[in-house]
């Protein structure tokens, strides 16, 4: 590993531990040339996910875009950035576990909605209104009624 201070490639590992819930290894290193200490992270290389947009064009999955959409939907709901980061990490993990490395943007939207429904109804409605392109109040009412029916069903089952 190249030292960020002197660019020497000889270093020794002082400490290693799991990070990101076991998805990476954090290593504390010391340069053998200048004694500079630095941290590196080792992660499994993932296969890029290709997103098929509504218009048929393809682009690489961009976690920043998903996080931005979540942030807008969750603005002023009390959900912190760490929780949103966890939602995006869970989404990425689900996508990486699939055998197909192409996914429709609609599938990503539905996975995000599924996560949001569990953590914030307000964020769910806000995200759904953009993602599902609500045209008027009837779309909001319909979604709220569906959510209410689902909650009543869950309460009856318990």
Curated annotation (Swiss-Prot):
Signal peptide: none annotated. GO terms for biological process: negative regulation of DNA-templated transcription. Pfam families: ATP-cone, Zn_ribbon_NrdR. One of its GO terms (molecular function) is ATP binding. InterPro entries: ATP-cone_dom, NrdR-like_N, RNR_NrdR-like. A zinc finger (unnamed) spans 3-34. Binds 1 zinc ion. Keywords: ATP-binding, DNA-binding, Metal-binding, Nucleotide-binding, Repressor, Transcription, Transcription regulation, Zinc, Zinc-finger. Residues 49-139 form the ATP-cone domain. Its cofactor is Zn(2+). Negatively regulates transcription of bacterial ribonucleotide reductase nrd genes and operons by binding to NrdR-boxes. PANTHER family: TRANSCRIPTIONAL REPRESSOR NRDR (PTHR30455:SF2). Belongs to the NrdR family. This is Transcriptional repressor NrdR. It comes from Synechococcus sp. (strain CC9902).
């Amino acid at each position: 590993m190249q030292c960020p201070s002197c660019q020497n490639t000889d270093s020794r590992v002082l400490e290693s531990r799991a990070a990101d819930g076991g998805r990476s290894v954090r290593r504390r290193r010391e340069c053998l040339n200048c004694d500079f200490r630095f941290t590196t992270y080792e992660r499994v290389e993932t296969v890029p996910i290709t997103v098929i947009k509504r218009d048929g064009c393809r682009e690489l999955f961009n976690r920043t875009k998903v996080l931005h959409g979540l942030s807008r939907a969750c603005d002023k709901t009390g959900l912190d950035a760490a929780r949103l980061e966890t939602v995006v990490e869970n989404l990425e993990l689900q996508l990486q576990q699939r055998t197909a490395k192409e996914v429709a943007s609609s599938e990503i939207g539905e996975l995000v909605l599924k996560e949001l429904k569990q953590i914030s109804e307000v964020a769910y409605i806000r995200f759904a209104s953009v993602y599902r392109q609500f045209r008027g109040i009837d779309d909001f009412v319909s979604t709220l009624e569906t959510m209410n029916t689902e909650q009543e069903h869950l309460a009856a089952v318990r």
